């Protein structure tokens, strides 16, 4: 089968951290809670303490889910970029190793979505 090419394709990424005015993107996926069908994307300051991210960014973002009020973050299991992760709540996102376009996964044992449906 013949393939016709339109030539070399070059692109300049537009989502590099330098284009975010000192901020960075952070993705977060709450496992077994498919009411949120994909990871949530947040624009955050690298110097924001992890505890502040939870209180001021994450909790308001997931507030609509019935399980959100039941989360015990001290029992949460975390992954950062597919690796086990134990956050230092007092340290900044940057000091926790969370950089531009990092993926956090949140697992809340015992909370399995609306009526256990994983949604």
Swiss-Prot record:
Requires DmpM for efficient turnover. The activity of DmpLNO oxygenase is inhibited by dithiothreitol (DTT) by a mechanism apparently involving H(2)O(2) generation. The keyword NAD applies. Coiled coil: none annotated. The lineage of its organism: Bacteria, Pseudomonadati, Pseudomonadota. Gene3D superfamilies: Phenol hydroxylase. GO terms for molecular function: phenol 2-monooxygenase activity. The keyword NAD applies. Keywords: Aromatic hydrocarbons catabolism, Monooxygenase, NAD, Oxidoreductase, Plasmid. Pfam families: Phenol_monoox. Part of a multicomponent enzyme which catalyzes the degradation of phenol and some of its methylated derivatives. DmpL, DmpN and DmpO form the oxygenase component of the complex. Required for growth on phenol and for in vitro phenol hydroxylase activity. The gene is dmpO. Its EC number is 1.14.13.244. This is Phenol 2-monooxygenase, oxygenase component DmpO. Pathway: Aromatic compound metabolism; phenol degradation. GO terms for biological process: phenol-containing compound catabolic process. It catalyses: phenol + NADH + O2 + H(+) = catechol + NAD(+) + H2O.
């Amino acid at each position: 089968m013949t393939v016709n090419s339109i030539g070399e394709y070059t692109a300049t990424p537009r989502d590099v951290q330098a284009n975010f005015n000192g901020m960075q993107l952070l993705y977060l996926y709450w496992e077994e809670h498919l009411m949120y069908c994909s990871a949530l994307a947040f624009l955050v300051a690298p110097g924001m303490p992890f505890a502040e991210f939870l209180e001021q960014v994450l909790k308001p973002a997931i507030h609509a889910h019935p399980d959100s009020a039941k989360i015990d973050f001290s029992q949460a299991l975390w992954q950062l970029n597919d690796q086990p992760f134990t956050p230092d709540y007092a340290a900044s996102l940057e000091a926790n190793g969370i950089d531009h376009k990092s993926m956090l996964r949140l697992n809340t044992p015992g909370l399995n979505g609306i009526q256990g449906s994983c949604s």
